[in-house]
Amino acid sequence: MKKNRFTYGLALGALGVVFGDIGTSPLYALKVTLSGIPINQFNILGVLSLIFWSLIIIVSFKYLMIIFRADNDGEGGILALLALMKHKSTKYQPLFYIVAIFGAGLLLGDGMLTPAISVVSAVEGLGTLSDKLYPYVLPIASVILVLLFSLQAKGTARIGYLFGPLILIWFITIAILGILQIVEHPVVLQAINPYHAIAFLVDEGLRGYFLLGGIFLVVTGGEALFADIGHFGKNPIRFSWFFIALPCLLLNYFGQGANLIVRPEEISNPFFMIAPPWFYLPLIIIATVATVIASQAVISATFSLTKQAVLLGLCPKIPIVQTSMLHSGQIYVPQINFILFIGTMAFCLAFKTSDNLAHAYGIAVNLEMLLVDAMVAYAAVSIWRWSTFNVIFLFGLFLLIDLAFLGANTHKFITGGWVPIVLAFFIAFIMYSWRYGLEYLRDNFYMNKEDISKILKQLQYKSLNQLPGVSAIFITDVYDKSGGSFLHFLKLNRSVPENVLIVNYIVDNIPYVHYSQRYEIVCLDEKVCKLVIHYGFMETINIPRSLEKACNKNILPFKFNVDTATFMVEIPNIMASKEKRSLSFYWQEKLFAFLMRNYSANLNIEFYKLPYNRTIAIGTYCIL
């Protein structure tokens, strides 16, 4: 398969994008976990053992070996997984639809917290230079984040190729710092033995269990491995993890532990304290660059997730800007960028330190991992045809581990973790209302219309006033399968262009559609045709470009020039009515009506890439 190809360039690229988040966890994870308990050899070995086995079981085994199997034709992520289940026509689709949109909301919440905790933790290294610099940590971090979000509209095409080498420098740096400490105190290598993890949990009891909330911070970012399969492929990601990221992370964690065994007072900032004093400033700079790259990767992943949601019809057609002519995956979503910016800055200003942010971080990622586990477990039974016993045994273990971490993370809900969860519920509700509203619109306003060919006969189509030399392209939306824009045009004008093409697009439950499966055409009359254009959920919808290719391939029965044709789109005005109940709640109808009014006219034209000077919007009125 194409997505399974391997090159060192792809592996380096994966290093810069996929592992930025999990790769910067050493800045704060061990510090947060060990805070509040005695810093002694027994506790340090226990915590290091838990870190080691968490990375091995959750990331190395569960994600890279099992979850990676659940790709959708080379694409990963929770929405791609939902599309896979729809494509395979599995049962319980409505249930997994709810699960997937809630998971997508959780990832958006994570996109606010990750830049905040990453950048703040890096800039906190200034405190190692002088205590007088601590008051400047938050202002400097805020300036960096403002610049980061402000530059999103420019794209990363010019500097994106540097991400891999820069993160490689980061991993090599933290590995060397760890090795220097391990050589002096090799006793920490005993932590590889799982006995130390078990003994620590038994000895600490309930307090040790809740420390798993800190341990979980070392695997946050692991969910990005699955989501980024489509960008780099499975094998480059696996190579980067097993040969670079995993060894370097373990060396650094163990190095921090080795230093704390002999210098427990350095728990205030164990990451920076393992470096020699002369290297503090260069390390702060390298760490800041690494956290900015990690934040950029999370922001880009959120943009990509939003595009998938729009194309799959899960949310309104919000503006999506292509920032690169060469790479379709490089996009900018202004409204999502603004939401992430406001959320990230609010977290920074409210929590102020990485320690405080850590008390809110992780629970959203934990829930998302749990949801992915459940969906992949069902895919293993219904799609892969694994035996029920094997699925229960394997995924039962995964779910047990994730539930254990979730229980340990529950206290984070009241210390700030509620924000991404509430946001996830809000986003899921918007997606649900949008999807349900479109289905109601289709079933009650468009599905019951008579077939166009019958209407053309009733109207005695050939006797209508003809507009010679005029070609019109009528675009129908996802909820309209009957050519509503064309019918409204006939009703209003009682005349027809010489050539009429009714275009409907369908986003299939696969990432990319082959050219041979792109077009379906049905001729309703000599000069009236209905064309269905198929897209994948990772593609960019461009109606004029697709029509131009169709004309060049002589797919259409008549010739017309796309550059001079007129495009027609229908703009429905939805009104909520208290007299009749269409959706679950009146305010849900109001929400859907608001979304339709604000994301129809101009955005439809932008979404389809139609020329403004040759596009006519036809209004219609619907009462829910």
UniProtKB/Swiss-Prot annotation:
Disulfide bonds: none annotated. The keyword Nucleotide-binding does not apply. The chain crosses the membrane at residues 10-30, 48-68, 94-114, 133-153, 159-179, 210-230, 242-262, 270-290, 331-351, 363-383, 388-408, 413-433. It catalyses: K(+)(in) + H(+)(in) = K(+)(out) + H(+)(out). One of its GO terms (molecular function) is potassium ion transmembrane transporter activity. It is found in: Cell inner membrane. It comes from the Bacteria. Keywords: Cell inner membrane, Cell membrane, Ion transport, Membrane, Potassium, Potassium transport, Symport, Transmembrane, Transmembrane helix, Transport. Pfam families: K_trans, K_trans_C. Belongs to the HAK/KUP transporter (TC 2.A.72) family. It comes from Legionella pneumophila subsp. pneumophila (strain Philadelphia 1 / ATCC 33152 / DSM 7513). PANTHER family: LOW AFFINITY POTASSIUM TRANSPORT SYSTEM PROTEIN KUP (PTHR30540:SF79), OSMOTIC STRESS POTASSIUM TRANSPORTER (PTHR30540). GO terms for cellular component: plasma membrane. It is a multi-pass membrane protein. This is Probable potassium transport system protein Kup 1. InterPro entries: K+_transporter, K_trans_C, K_trans_N, Kup. Transport of potassium into the cell. Likely operates as a K(+):H(+) symporter.
